[in-house]
Amino acid sequence: MIKGSSLKRFKSLVMAAIFSVSIISTAIASSAADQIPFPYDAKYPNGAYSCLADSQSIGNNLVRSEWEQWKSAHITSNGARGYKRVQRDASTNYDTVSEGLGYGLLLSVYFGEQQLFDDLYRYVKVFLNSNGLMSWRIDSSGNIMGKDSIGAATDADEDIAVSLVFAHKKWGTSGGFNYQTEAKNYINNIYNKMVEPGTYVIKAGDTWGGSNVTNPSYFAPAWYRIFADFTGNSGWINVANKCYEIADKARNSNTGLVPDWCTANGTPASGQGFDFYYDAIRYQWRAAIDYSWYGTAKAKTHCDAISNFFKNIGYANIKDGYTISGSQISSNHTATFVSCAAAAAMTGTDTTYAKNIYNECVKVKDSGNYTYFGNTLRMMVLLYTTGNFPNLYTYNSQPKPDLKGDVNNDGAIDALDIAALKKAILTQTTSNISLTNADMNNDGNIDAIDFAQLKVKLLN
C-alpha cells in the first residue's frame, strides 16, 4: 500500500509525466487487443514440467531478451518486397526458406507482435505457388531460386498454417487479414497437396514424397489435432496416427533414434539419408509438444527413449549426428542438437537431467556463419521449456496478480520500486530487477516511459 507521505513525494513527478503518459496510452489503445497475451506462465496439461528455468520470471526475462536478439539477426526488410522476411545467415548469402517463415510466424504470434506477423505473412503470400503453398527458397533480393525452388516444403507450410490459427485466437478479425479464412484455406491446401490420398502419409512437399519417402521431422501431430478440430476434417487425426505408425517402424529399438528420411514402412528411402542428423533431431521437439498438449502416449514413449539416449551420453557431450543405432558421426556440440534434446526431456521425470539439459540449451548458442537453424530451434525450445508455448487454440488465459510495477519483485509496489527502476535505467543494468514487472507498457524495453507509467500507478 502507498502511504500519504509517499504520495506527496511522488506527486510533483507524476504530474510532470501526465502529458507523455496520455500520449502513450493513446498509442497503446490503438493496437489490436491480444486475447492471450505473453508471457503465458502456462502449466501444460500433461507432463511433470512446464518451466525448467529457476523461476518463471527468470524464464520470461530470458526469452524476451533472446527474442530481441533473434529478431535483430534474422528479421529484415531487405529484399522483402516491402514487407518483412526471415533471413538465414552468411552461409547461404542471407536467403530465405519457407521453413524460416513458419518459425518466424510462430514466434511473432507467441510474442504477440501482430504487425510483424502480418508483414511476414504478406511476404508468404507473395510467394504462394499454384497450389496455394509457399515456394521453399527465395534469394536475398526476393527472387525464387530456380524451378526446383517453386515447390513447397511440408514442415514450413504446416507451421505457417497453425500460426494463422493461433493468430485468429489471439487477435480475432483485427489486423490486415481474416486469419480464420486464411488458416482454413491454407490447411485445406496442405491436406489436398501434402497428404498422400488413401494412406494419410505426410509427403515431403506438394509435388513429391509419400509412402516412398517421408521425413519424420516434418511430423507435427499436435498441429494435426488442431487442424482436425478447426476445419472439421477428421482425416487429420488419421494423419497424426500414421506419423506414429511410421516412426514406430523407423526408430531404432535400442536407442529410439529416428532417421532423417524413410519410407512409410520405416526402411531407408532411395537417395535419402537414414541417420539421426539435422532433420531427424526435430522429431522429438514436435512429438514432445504433442505430449505436453494432448498427452499422447506414443509421444512420451518416443521422447523418453531419445532422452535416455542423450542422458547416457551426458548433456555436455551431445554431438550433432548419430546413426540410428547410436554411433557418433559428427563432433560438434550445437544449439540444434542441445535444444531439441532439452525438448525431449519435457516428457520425462528426471528433474536433475531436465534442469541440466535446459541450462545447457541456454548456454549453447551458435555463432559464426552458421547461426540460423540452430539458434532458431533454440528460440522455439526456450519458449516451450519456460512455460511460454501453450496450445493457443485451446488455451484460456487465467487471471494473474497484477505485478506490473513490482520492479524489485518483493510482492509490493512502493517507493523501492521507483528507486530500483530509476537505477536500472540510469545504469543500464537490469540483472537485479524483474524485467516483466518493470516493462509497464509491454514493449520489450525498460525506459523513461515505464518510469512515467509506474509513477502514475503509484498515484492511483
UniProtKB/Swiss-Prot annotation:
Asked whether the keyword Kinase is assigned, the reply is no
* E.C. numbers: 3.2.1.4
Q: Which residues form the Dockerin domain?
A: 400-460
What does the record give as its pathway? Glycan metabolism; cellulose degradation
Identify the CDD domains for this entry.
Answer: Dockerin_I
Q: Where is the signal peptide?
A: 1-32
Q: How does it assemble?
A: Monomer.
Q: Which family does it belong to?
A: Belongs to the glycosyl hydrolase 8 (cellulase D) family.
- What protein name is recorded for this chain? Endoglucanase C
Annotated source species: Ruminiclostridium cellulolyticum (strain ATCC 35319 / DSM 5812 / JCM 6584 / H10)
